[in-house]
Amino acid sequence: MCNYALKFNPHGEADIERTREKADSLLPGSTAWYDGLKAQGILKDTTIVGYRDFKVHACYVPAANPAKANGTAIVVHGYGDNHFVFLYLVRMYRDNLNYNVLFPDLQYHGYSEGDHAQMGWYDRFDVEKWAEVAHGIFGDDFVVLHGVSMGAATVMMASGDELPPYVKAVVEDCGYSSAWDQFKVNLKQSFHLPPFPILTSASMVSKSRYGWSFKEASSVEQLKKSTVPMLFIHGDADDFVPFEHLQKNYDAKTTGYKEMWVGEGAVHANSYAKHPEEYEAHVKAFLEKVKTL
């Protein structure tokens, strides 16, 4: 079960073509947009040494009007995906909201190294480092962390750490309350099995092999320590990361400004695709509100 959940295949560079196709299915023309900016030298690649000394990769692109950039967004992908998949968010931030954007590959995904999918728990350390890198590249004092699915769990988990003062906001879209809660749902949906003994054993293997347990990887526990303003998004038709995770996450954050928006009729990671104008409007209004706090 541990290998099944955390060491899936194909992954990494072997999975690039599928994710490029997925990016275009979510917003047509996304890979052509990406390839065009890259050919012009506007969109660039970079690598750093991430957590546990694995080399990790990201792309970055300046705002459409760099001289008047409104800030910098760190866009974080989900489980089994990579930096290509959520190009719709990169395009939203860069082209429509005039933000600089850095969008990484988490460990074991895309062009990044890694020995397993970390479910956000260790990924948060790399995202925090990427925020520092983006701040160095663009010089902004307003950075927003925006994640979807496992990426949303990653940014929620990061929000409970001590973040630099330029990280001003977090947007989480359909993140799970903990790795344990998520795998429990998956185990029931896919195999009609209870968490004991399989999930319990897999969590113990993860702790022994990688240093973290499924219950330890908790968005909820990190949110209890979070003070950074946060927008919570979830589709009410989501049964992959069940909709009730939204309220559980939202209620866990008791300090700092927060908002909630529900994507009506949206399945998992589909709120933007179903309501693109409304999604963008809520993100824009939230970020503008944060700037007044």
What is the predicted role of each segment?
Residues 1-49:
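An N-terminal hydrophobic leader/cap segment in hydrolases
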Residues 79-93:
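The serine-hydrolase catalytic nucleophile loop
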Residues 89, 219, 228, 242-251:
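Short alpha-helix in the alpha/beta-hydrolase fold that links the catalytic acid
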Residues 90-113:
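Conserved alpha/beta-hydrolase
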Residues 117-138:
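Alpha/beta-hydrolase active-site loop
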Residues 157-212:
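Hydrolase active-site cap/lid region
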Residues 225-227, 232-234, 238:
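Short beta-strand/loop motif that positions the catalytic acidic residue
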Residues 266-276:
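Catalytic histidine-centered segment of alpha/beta-hydrolase-like enzymes
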